[in-house]
């Protein structure tokens, strides 16, 4: 149960009562893990954020009247295995450009919400990132095969900072969102450009579907020159909940300005077993190309289970296996086995 720290009524200038609240929330997630990669010794480790990144944060809102409210979120990632500040720690499978010491590397924004939708300003996850978790197997954990298989390409930047974000209200289950991160700090040697993203999502009954696009030009050499490391990602998600099983699938295409392309696909299923136990499995595949010729193929599969001890605490276990095969090169295989516990507050 999330705990309200502050809830007070303050007289507005109009004489009406404006409600304000601030809530402390968080997740602590730690796993014992063993992993091995071809030609390397097996590693036995303790990891923070097996299923969800460990974090704590503050969020609040103020009723401004007339259906308008102000809001804010400050969210820190940390390493529960060491206690270290993690900046954007635990943002599974993505790039985070914040320094490791960033106090609120996961989120830090202020905004306004009303009948028009919601605006946010600050360190806001992108509109593309909104959809990335919604059809992923093994509870969208670090053990989902898509994270190890798709990551062979380029991990998208999910929280670039310096962002403007807008999400629409729902229209019959359909929502739209867009975000843009400013390209700051232009110099004579850095043609800093922005990062834009959009999405459309549908959620109704057992069906979820989304389409998202993100173009990242946040780092390009030479003012006025063509970006050499700009990435364009297009992601489609779909899930269908049959009750006895929830089917999941995603497809992502990444195109870069250096003529590299990556086609990425994953499918999975979540199976509830009684009220407390959920089983999940998934398969992921990706193929990279340069100038139309295949350079590498990757695939992997995983299995996971979580058992709820309460509404806020669960234990979990997972196993993931992946392999990559460069064209004309040697196949590399890896495996990960984990068991962990997560508590949220």
Predicted feature locations:
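Solvent-exposed loop/turn segments connecting transmembrane beta-strands
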Residues: 154-161, 182-192, 255-262, 290-297, ...
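Outer-membrane beta-barrel architecture
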Residues: 13, 57-59, 109-111, 165-167, ...
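Gram-negative bacterial Sec-dependent N-terminal signal peptides
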Residues: 1-20
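Detector for outer-membrane/organellar transmembrane beta-barrel domains
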Residues: 191-302, 307-308, 319
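Outer-membrane beta-barrel "beta-signal"
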Residues: 171, 303, 307-309, 333-345
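Outer membrane beta-barrel
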Residues: 20-34, 43-183, 192-194, 201-208
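Transmembrane beta-strands of outer-membrane beta-barrel proteins
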Residues: 22-30, 66, 70-74, 119, ...
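Transmembrane beta-strands of outer-membrane beta-barrel pores
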Residues: 30-36, 76-80, 125-127, 180-184, ...
């Amino acid at each position: 149960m999330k705990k309200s720290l502050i809830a007070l009524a303050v007289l507005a200038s109009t004489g009406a009562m404006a409600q304000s609240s601030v809530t402390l929330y968080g997740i602590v997630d730690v796993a014992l893990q063993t992993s091995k990669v071809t030609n390397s010794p097996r590693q036995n480790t303790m990891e923070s954020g097996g299923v969800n990144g460990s974090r704590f944060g503050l969020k609040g809102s103020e009723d401004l009247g007339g259906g308008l409210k102000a809001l804010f979120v400050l969210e820190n990632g940390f390493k529960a295995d060491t206690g270290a500040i993690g900046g954007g720690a635990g943002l599974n499978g993505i790039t985070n450009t914040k320094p490791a010491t960033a106090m609120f590397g996961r989120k830090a924004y202020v905004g306004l919400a009303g009948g028009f939708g919601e605006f946010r300003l600050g360190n806001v996850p992108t509109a593309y990132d909104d959809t990335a978790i919604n059809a992923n197997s093994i509870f969208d954990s670090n053990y989902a095969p898509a994270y190890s298989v798709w990551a062979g390409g380029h991990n998208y930047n999910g929280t670039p900072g310096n962002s403007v974000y807008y999400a629409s209200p729902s229209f019959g289950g359909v929502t739209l969102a867009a975000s843009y991160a400013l390209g700051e700090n232009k110099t004579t040697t850095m043609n800093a450009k922005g990062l834009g993203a959009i999405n459309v999502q549908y959620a109704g009954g057992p069906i979820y579907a989304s389409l998202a696009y993100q173009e990242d030009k946040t780092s390009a050499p030479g003012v006025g020159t063509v970006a050499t490391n700009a990435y364009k990602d297009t992601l489609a998600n779909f899930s269908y909940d049959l009750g006895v099983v929830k089917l999941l699938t995603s497809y992502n295409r990444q195109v870069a300005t250096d003529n590299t392309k990556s086609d990425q696909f994953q499918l999975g299923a979540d199976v509830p077993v009684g009220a407390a136990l959920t089983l999940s499995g998934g398969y992921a595949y990706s193929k990279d190309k340069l100038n139309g010729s295949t350079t590498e193929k990757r695939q992997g599969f995983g299995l996971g289970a979580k058992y709820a001890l309460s509404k806020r605490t669960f234990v979990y276990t997972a196993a993931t296996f992946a392999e990559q095969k460069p064209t004309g090169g040697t196949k590399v295989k890896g495996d990960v086995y984990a068991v962990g516990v997560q508590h949220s507050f």
